[in-house]
A protein has these predicted regions:
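A conserved mid-protein helix/loop that constitutes part of the nucleotide-sugar donor-binding site
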Residues: 181-195
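Conserved small/polar residues in nucleotide/adenosyl-binding loops
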Residues: 255-256
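Short His-centered aromatic/hydrophobic patch
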Residues: 75-80
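A short, active-site helix/loop in glycosyltransferases that binds the activated sugar's phosphate group
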Residues: 125-149, 156-161
Length: 256
């Protein structure tokens, strides 16, 4: 079996880094394991675009013009694949589409948007989700039958982190750290740490989607014990090193 492996970040480069324990395998969504099962990957040539539309147009062109044969389109997200999925729903794209869906499917109060959404999901042949709760909530929308949804236990690449710790034998963990950018409740986190003298290092992107974390953070008068570091791009190895030097990881999710 040959798949077209679509990822929303650099793939081939990250895969090579994974081989040298410089990139955690779980961010590659199974790519390091595929060869073991006789699955060959045609890797998407990723490019970053500030515009969602430009990303969709680029991804559509790359996929439709791909000269290497493949049987299945496998996406770690549907971001950028929207036009291909609509073509599949229309019967104009013939390859099965399998994607990771990172949230539960939702219903819209707007009738036109809801109709488009229901048609859109007809173009996805199979979806992987992270929990039974996400599957249950998705089924409640009626947009996908149960046989299309599959629970996959996604977790950290332990070999990557074990190897990292072996390279830091003299580390002395101290303080708190928080990393990441998706649905982070920085309001609650900063309120809590501003009320203590505990040391916190926060590594976060200035913005993520419609959320401007920098604006939220700048409303606070932060004590010296709370340090904010704005990140750019995907830097899992660097952040893993930072985390390994801390006593505790803090993550407070923002309600959807």
């Amino acid at each position: 079996l040959t798949i077209y492996f679509y990822h929303t970040r650099l793939t081939r480069e990250s895969y090579e880094e994974w081989k040298d324990y410089k990139f955690p395998g779980h961010i590659l969504y199974g790519l390091p394991l595929l060869e073991k099962y006789g699955i060959r990957s045609v890797m998407h040539k990723y490019k970053a675009f500030p515009s969602r539309l430009k990303l969709m147009l680029y991804a559509t062109k790359e996929i439709l013009c791909c000269k290497e044969p493949y049987e299945v389109l496998y996406g770690t997200s549907f971001r950028g694949l929207e036009l291909i999925i609509l073509l599949r729903a229309l019967g104009l794209y013939r390859k099965p589409i399998v994607i990771w869906h990172h949230t539960a499917l939702k219903t819209s109060s707007r009738k036109i948007r809801e109709r488009i959404s229901r048609f859109f999901y007809k173009g996805i042949d199979h979806m992987f989700l992270f929990s039974k709760k996400l599957i249950k909530d998705s089924l409640a929308t009626g947009k996908a039958p149960e046989e299309k949804l599959q629970l996959i236990h996604w977790g950290p690449d332990l070999a990557f982190y074990d190897h990292l710790l072996q390279t830091m034998p003299d580390r002395k963990p101290e303080g708190f750290i928080s990393t990441g950018k998706e649905n982070r409740d920085v309001d609650t986190m900063l309120q809590a740490f501003c009320a203590t003298d505990q040391q916190l290092d926060l590594y976060i992107a200035p913005t993520n989607g419609s959320v401007n974390y920098q604006q939220i953070i700048e409303r606070f008068c932060l004590p010296d014990s709370v340090r904010v570091h704005y990140t750019d791009g995907v830097i899992p190895y660097l952040l893993a090193q930072k985390v390994a030097r801390k006593s505790c990881v803090v993550k407070i999710g923002r309600a959807h």
